[in-house]
Structure formats: C-alpha cells, structure tokens
Swiss-Prot record:
Protein name in the entry: Protein PA-X
Keywords tagged on the record: Decay of host mRNAs by virus, Eukaryotic host gene expression shutoff by virus, Host cytoplasm, Host gene expression shutoff by virus, Host mRNA suppression by virus, Host nucleus, Host-virus interaction
Localization in the cell: Host cytoplasm; Host nucleus
Role of this protein: Plays a major role in the shutoff of the host protein expression by cleaving mRNAs probably via an endonuclease activity. This host shutoff allows the virus to escape from the host antiviral response. Hijacks host RNA splicing machinery to selectively target host RNAs containing introns for destruction. This may explain the preferential degradation of RNAs that have undergone co- or post-transcriptional processing.
Free-text comment on this protein's domains from its UniProt entry: The probable endonuclease active site in the N-terminus and the basic amino acid cluster in the C-terminus are important for the shutoff activity. The C-terminus acts as a nuclear localization signal. The C-terminus is recruited to host protein complexes involved in nuclear Pol II RNA processing.
Positions of the UniProt region annotated as Disordered: 202-223
Keyword Nucleus: no
Any Pfam family the entry gives: Flu_PA
GO biological process assignments: viral RNA genome replication; viral translational frameshifting
GO MF term list: RNA binding
UniProt key word Nucleotide-binding: no
Family: Belongs to the influenza viruses PA-X family.
Annotated catalytic residues: 80, 108
Length: 252
C-alpha cells in the first residue's frame, strides 16, 4: 500500500500526509491504510478548491487557466493540510474578519462565497452513515458537510452540493480511479475491511527483514509548497502544482 500511495499521489500531498501523521505520532510505513486515506482526503480537498474563484462582483466563477486575472480571489481557503497551530490561526483570522462562528473542530475549507466552513468526508462505507457520524461529532449547523464515496455517491447538508456538477464529477472520477487501481493491486479489500487490514499488517511485518529487496526509488526533494505553505494556498500557482495529482495512477 505504501508503494501505491507514493506512486499514485502528487509528492506534495504525500509529504503533507506524512507530516500530519507524524504530528500525531503515527507511522505511514506501518499504518499504510490511514496513509492512503489521508492522501485521498487531502486530494479531494484540493480538487474541491481548485479552479474556483470569486470575481470583483462577488460572483463565483470557474477558471482553469494557469494565470487567472489578478482581480480574482480564490473562493475557498484550504485549512486541511496545515499544521494545527497554523490551521487554527487561519480559522481565527477568518472568524475575526467575517464574524462567522468559530467551529469547535478544525474544518477542511472555508467558502468565501457562502461564508461558511466546510467539512469534507471521503468514505469507504455508506455515505449517509458517515454523514451522520460527522454531523454527530461536529454538532454545529454552521459547518457545512459534504461527503463523497468511492462508488460515486455523495451527501451534503440540506442537499446543497456547493460545487457545479462537473467539478463534483471530477472528484468522483478520481475516487473511482483510486478504487480501481487499488483493486487491481489486491489492496482494496484490506483498505475497506479493518480486520483484513490487520491480517495484512501482520503478514507485512512478518515478511519485513533488514535489507530485504531493493528499496523503491523516491524523490526526496522538498516541495517549494511545503517551505511556504501559507502563501501557497492564496496563490494561483497552486492549480499548476496540484494538477498532476488529478492524473490516473500509473500502472505497475
């Protein structure tokens, strides 16, 4: 699974996921299913945000050009992917500026058009079950919830899906592709079933020995985005930086 994640996702997303797991004392090499889930969630958050801007009249528009008009403002502020301290700093700043109620839990995005925080969910289970779990945890009508599944289903607060159909279809297609690629490598069942995942983990740990096999070649170059994470979310260059992550996973 770890090899799959490093092949399938944009290196920047992989680095952010590793950083997030280490912040909570988790090891991406051991908790590989969680590693894959975090990368998937990060990518969906970025795809949700990408190409969406607000023009000078306050209208939401979609711009896929790499160099949008300077008067355009990103519609979504990405909170997911930052370290906790910076994430709360961004949330506090938004609340102070917009007078929106501060959430109890860190949300994933802020929508400047609808003036609301958004919680994004990606589930391997039934969307309505995961939606209820999220709503139960958040306990706030102010935070908008949008759940996607790997089967193309989705569910959102008051059936308000925020994005246009084409943007949502792009996300669903990517999730379906990830599922298909996992299945083709025999990884999907363990990704869905915790019991199967534990069995696979024991098997993997048993087979791991020092110097066993050749290590996978991975680029360890630090992404410029990680050095300047804060301004990156505000700059239009993020579209180009993340576009590669929308591509189909390479076959082995």
């Amino acid at each position: 699974m770890e090899d799959f994640v490093r092949q399938c996702f944009n290196p920047m997303i992989v680095e952010l996921a590793e950083k997030a797991m280490k912040e909570y004392g988790e090891d991406p090499k051991i908790e590989t299913n969680k590693f894959a889930a975090i990368c998937t969630h990060l990518e969906v958050c970025f795809m949700y945000s990408d190409f969406h801007f607000i023009d000078e009249r306050g209208e939401s528009i979609i711009v896929e050009s790499g160099d949008p008009n300077a008067l355009l403002k990103h519609r979504f502020e990405i909170i997911e992917g930052r370290d906790r301290t910076m994430a709360w700093t961004v949330v506090n700043s938004i609340c102070n500026t917009t007078r929106v109620e501060k959430p109890k839990f860190l949300p994933d995005l802020y929508d400047y058009k609808e003036n609301r925080f958004i919680e994004i969910g990606v589930t391997r289970r039934e969307v309505h079950i995961y939606y209820l779990e999220k709503a139960n945890k958040i306990k706030s009508e102010k935070t908008h919830i949008h759940i996607f599944s790997f089967t193309g289903e989705e569910m959102a607060t008051k059936a308000d899906y925020t994005l246009d159909e084409e943007s949502r279809a792009r996300i669903k297609t990517r999730l379906f592709t990830i599922r298909q690629e996992m299945a083709s490598r025999g990884l999907w069942d363990s990704f869905v079933s915790p019991r199967e995942a534990k069995r696979q983990l024991k098997k993997d740990l048993k087979s791991q020995e020092p110097c066993a096999g050749s290590p996978t070649k991975v680029s360890h170059r630090t992404s410029p985005a990680l050095k300047t994470l804060e301004p990156m979310w505000m700059d239009s260059s993020r579209t180009a930086a993340l576009r590669a992550s929308f591509l189909k996973c390479p076959k082995k």
